[in-house]
Design a protein with these regions (language model features):
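Conserved, mostly hydrophobic/aromatic
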Residues: 30, 34, 60, 90, ...
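N-terminal small/glycine-rich loop or linker at the start of catalytic domains
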Residues: 1-15, 107-110, 144-162, 226-251
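Alpha-helix-loop-beta-strand connector modules within alpha/beta enzyme cores
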Residues: 51-73, 124-131, 135, 291-304
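Active-site mouth loops of central-metabolism enzymes
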Residues: 6-21, 71-80, 159-170, 246-258
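N-terminal beta1-alpha1-beta2 module of alpha/beta enzyme domains
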Residues: 1-64, 68, 163, 292
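Active-site-adjacent beta->alpha loops and helix N-cap segments on the catalytic face
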Residues: 49-56, 191-206, 283-289
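Internal, glycine-rich beta/alpha segment that forms the wall or movable "lid"
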Residues: 79-181, 194-206, 210, 214-215, ...
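Hydrophobic faces of well-ordered beta-strands that scaffold small-molecule active sites
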Residues: 3-7, 38-40, 68-71, 98-102, ...
């Protein structure tokens, strides 16, 4: 089972340069730890500093090598030609394979702030993804109808490798869409182990219906790997007790190296091939230490 990293993009900082520096340091730590992939997220109209995906990933790739990297795009909030152009440039900067993570997105505030009707998300998503795929294959694209009409659109540079698409989804219709349209489904960080098993079964059934074979089966987890049990008690347990992101505590992966390895091994036994981790603590030194120890977790899982 591979372990990648999705870097936290939002920071409550007095100096906005500190948040960007924290992301660079975390990417460097993930590279040094030998993690298998690097990703950043996508959100808009935020009260706290949120470092936007295309720009920050371009910087983070300087810390990365030929291992896969990518970014999440909430497709209903973007014009597909613009996304395809961003992907083409990022894929040219990356030394390895570029992965597009995408999702419908949520939150009335960001949709209202971007002037997009949240009720139109599914149709906008499917139309955008189709155009992005075609552009990233090097096609000239004309679309007469729908939410994104374009005439004679093309991009350069085109990604040097075929674009791999992971679709994040939670509701049954969205999981079916991920099976129908994606190369992989990305399971969410809010899922408890029992929910993760149930949704994986739904996804497998949908893949069978649509005659699709996924390239991988990734799941997102929010984690903290402590050096000792006292470290876990000091840094992670207060965050969990405070109701981290409104998640069920069973969805969070917290413990020492051996404990976290055991928790993640369960997902491999279910059939997940990749775990994409994000640090649940804000303290930068603690997060960097946890990232380094995720590398130790990875080694334990590889040796098992």
């Amino acid at each position: 089972m591979r372990i990648g990293v999705s870097l936290k993009s939002v920071y409550a900082v007095d100096d906005v340069r500190d948040g960007a520096r924290h992301m660079v340091e975390r990417a460097r730590a993930a590279a040094d730890a030998g993690l298998d992939s690097l990703f950043v997220g996508d959100h808009h109209v935020t009260p706290l500093a949120y470092y936007q995906n295309t720009a920050i990933l371009g910087r983070l790739l300087a810390e990365w090598d030929a291992r896969p990297a990518g970014a999440l795009y909430v497709l209903p909030l973007w014009h597909p030609v613009l996304v395809a152009e961003q992907i083409g440039t990022l894929a040219a900067i990356a030394q390895g394979r570029f992965v597009l993570q995408c999702a419908l997105g949520g939150g009335e505030q960001q949709f209202a702030g971007m002037g997009v009707d949240v009720r139109r998300r599914p149709s906008r998503f499917e139309a955008a993804l189709d155009t992005i795929r075609r552009l990233c294959r090097g096609e000239e694209v004309t679309v007469e109808e729908g939410p994104y009409p374009v005439r004679g659109a093309r991009i350069a540079p085109v990604p040097p490798e075929p674009l791999e698409v992971w679709i994040g989804a939670a509701a049954p219709p969205a999981i079916d869409r991920a099976a129908r349209l994606g190369d992989a489904w990305l399971a969410g960080p809010e899922l408890t182990p029992s929910m993760a098993r149930e949704q994986l079964d739904q996804y497998r059934e949908a893949c069978e219906r649509h005659g699709r074979t996924p390239t991988c089966v990734p799941i997102r987890r929010d984690v903290y790997v402590g050096a000792t049990r006292d470290d876990v008690t000091k840094h992670a347990e207060p965050v969990v007790a405070a109701g981290y992101r409104g998640f069920d505590p069973a969805a969070l992966v917290v413990g020492t190296v051996d404990e976290v390895a055991e928790q993640l091994r369960v997902f491999g036994e279910m059939g997940y091939t990749d775990v994409i981790v994000r640090q649940l603590v804000d303290d930068q030194d603690a997060a960097l230490g946890s990232i380094a120890r995720v590398g130790e977790v990875r080694s334990l899982l590889l040796d098992a």
